């Protein structure tokens, strides 16, 4: 390196800095013949590069996507990940052999016990399996109970070209004292009648 400055405490300024280029770290060799032999690239001494790699602590859990810089200013490129680690990162795809990947799906609507259940993207094969399983469970329950009940389960699947119907939310009984049958309690009814009679008289 070529330096300009006084020996008695003056600032050392590299020649590259005088030309507007960034200064190079002192551990680099910058002989012009070595740079020309390397195609103009900066040549690092092998000892300095090995020392810099030892100083770098790389966490195995992080992905080293970009070159990193050690405390000495030495740039160390990331090491390629082992093949086993790369295979671990790939998501596993499980394909069920009985259901092709392009099976048409439709919403499945089940009405049971006053509740409406809607399942999106249900295949016809899965719906058939569900119906068979439900019939099996109902037959087992009817056989064990000894009752002569007629348990029918209806599974409705709309055609795929129709938009799904949205059901209104269930109506909650009003908190005004009206019961589910629409009959007011007798005491409130009598009180309301007295109020209306007095209002008519005024």
From Swiss-Prot:
Residues 1-31 are annotated as: Disordered. Ubiquitinated. Targeted for degradation by the SCF(COI1) E3 ubiquitin ligase-proteasome pathway during jasmonate signaling. Transmembrane segments: none annotated. A motif (Nuclear localization signal) lies at residues 187-194. Residues 1-11 have a biased composition (Gly residues). Residues 101-136 form the Tify domain. One of its GO terms (cellular component) is nucleus. It comes from the Eukaryota. Coiled coil: none annotated. It is found in: Nucleus. One of its GO terms (biological process) is regulation of jasmonic acid mediated signaling pathway. Keywords: Jasmonic acid signaling pathway, Nucleus, Transcription, Transcription regulation, Ubl conjugation. Its main location: nucleus. Residues 12-21 have a biased composition (Low complexity). A motif (Jas) lies at residues 185-200. Belongs to the TIFY/JAZ family. The jas domain (185-200) is required for interaction with COI1. Repressor of jasmonate responses. This is Protein TIFY 11g. It comes from Oryza sativa subsp. japonica (Rice).
